[in-house]
């Protein structure tokens, strides 16, 4: 049992203890205030000094306590935090007579200390594990989408940019032919790659500038531009456009199809609120949380629209930051990929991942569908299926799914299906002569293994706890703390906001357990025997 009346001995960033003579409220602290000081005491704050240009008036440790406390109170704006520093007795006690920092100092501190904020977050998580607040056996991962600060109509679509870049390239090739006709170039554009065309047009532009023509000559009725000046303007405009297109394509990258002009890190994606899938795409980030015993033990951020590629980065970060290794991993069907299964098993994790066909596979319609390869007889040694009519369906090709990274085989019936009495039930809307389908055999086997794990007694218990712990953290952040849109531009600053919110949720949960004297065992719902 914990003694909540015990005083907290304050210390500075170097760990030197002191007794405050300015508004010392250590004996009158609220449970969440006392818990915050307890968890923040004795951490390594040395990394904060490296990002400050001069010695700050407010100690980095005190500034971190002030910001986390403000997030716990639901105040995330730097101006609101500044007002809180002048009025809140707890923060005044933490400042110990030092003038309250202004909003610029607070904002600059959060902006420059993103990595240091992440470091103390994981220091606190390790401390929670050391005092027995975490189960340290099963980790639950889930993700959500939070809207970026970027404007809603600032979208840049990769396909549209690529299409315009192709048109611009064709125009530049025509302009090179025009330069040849004017005697400004002797290079023929036919058969040349675009890099050579681009370099030659830059030379043409320089040659026109050397002619001493009036490149800014006015245009309009009664004025005729010199053909070389007209060519110069067209070349300059298209060269600028092709540079802009190349920069946009490079910023978007290979793994996404859009970005925002005002926040290039954000990707336009469909939000969770758009259940009917008829709303507007919004610039947002994919935020991931790993939970254990109702505490958030890990956070990542990405611009992926799905959760396929977020499992491995999260587990790599947990292995790097935490002082222990989990044995079980649990997630929903959004993480159901071969790549994730193989990584988890290769690194010693037992994957409790719900298959994407978990619900539909239980229906009578699914189980009685003779056209699905899952319901056909499969010869694993010779790699072929046998349909409901006893005909052989052999493998004729293979491929890899770009989204999930799963390999699949292409199977086709060795005989024509014309005249088969089961064709209408087996092929339904297909107009092909013979049965053909793609079968993810490797993924199929992994799903069978995952289904067996999830249907075991331990799997049922883990699934029940997943719905409580993984979803509960988002309920605190998005529901109670009203985090629906980030207030900063860029992925790094958005991630700092997310970390601070996760930090605040952890402290509040620890305070509730400490106040209710529930610190003996980690949160875990045990399945009662029937």
Where on the chain are the PLM-derived regions?
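Anion-binding and metal-coordination hotspots
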Residues: 5-6, 10, 56, 67, ...
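Basic, short loop/linker segments at the boundary and entry of helix-turn-helix/winged-helix-like folds
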Residues: 26-68
